[in-house]
């Protein structure tokens, strides 16, 4: 059987339903309890072999619907997808050089783990291209080496991440939840947001999982879930981008069941009652003038999948 000439993997964005941030640990990372929720906003990563490159070496290209976001994607070795290919190549016998093409729909530097999702997709795509047959458990270990948020897009759905966020345990979810994501101009540096968090909260307690949130997910109760959404990084994101406070308030005024900054921001997430309510909420947010654009999505959805 001939090896494939290219492989495309579709990978979802995430929203953090709970991001509890503890003190800095001895390894320099913050302890986290992070409830990840995969939503139907997807990047597509396509890999194809390049015989003129060393095994694991990658060249990158990117396109997408939003040129301002595409322009912010690094095309050098700092790109997590390129690092994923290089890492996997050290662990499979028939690695080649690769061209990695990313079609972006997940906001860049928006707090929805777009770069991490692309890295997860690159692991799956390169393993299929190189016929590595790497077990999913091993891919999860490699993903954790790349970054705290890279493992979750491999499994998708809804999961709690502990440690620095990479130790995953799936959570039961009943039904489907509907979301609006409000996009704003510019990004926010995760490093700067965590630094501001440390300044604002130097004596952070150990992070915990919220039983009310877990129960709301298991019951499929959107109203209870909306009331349980929390993000410890939100005050830091608002300190760096105060205008996000107006955006969150606009969503609440328009009837969102819950509103929060997604991850380190600046994208903001709003929970709706239904798909119709999500469309109405998105229109109200655009009309408010507090965001550049909106997208609607639902979750949970599966993780990185070959298409």
From Swiss-Prot:
One GO process term, biological-process aspect: terpenoid biosynthetic process
List of residues binding ATP: 107-117
Highest taxon above the source species: Bacteria
Record's keyword terms, sorted: ATP-binding, Isoprene biosynthesis, Kinase, Nucleotide-binding, Transferase
EC number(s) on file: 2.7.1.148
Active site per UniProt: 14, 149
Transcription regulation is among the record's keywords: no
Species whose genome carries this gene: Thermobifida fusca (strain YX)
An example Gene Ontology molecular-function term: ATP binding
TM ranges: none
Keyword ATP-binding appears in the UniProt entry: yes
Role this protein plays: Catalyzes the phosphorylation of the position 2 hydroxy group of 4-diphosphocytidyl-2C-methyl-D-erythritol.
Protein name stated in the entry: 4-diphosphocytidyl-2-C-methyl-D-erythritol kinase
Reactions accelerated catalytically: 4-CDP-2-C-methyl-D-erythritol + ATP = 4-CDP-2-C-methyl-D-erythritol 2-phosphate + ADP + H(+)
Family: Belongs to the GHMP kinase family. IspE subfamily.
Annotated pathway: Isoprenoid biosynthesis; isopentenyl diphosphate biosynthesis via DXP pathway; isopentenyl diphosphate from 1-deoxy-D-xylulose 5-phosphate: step 3/6
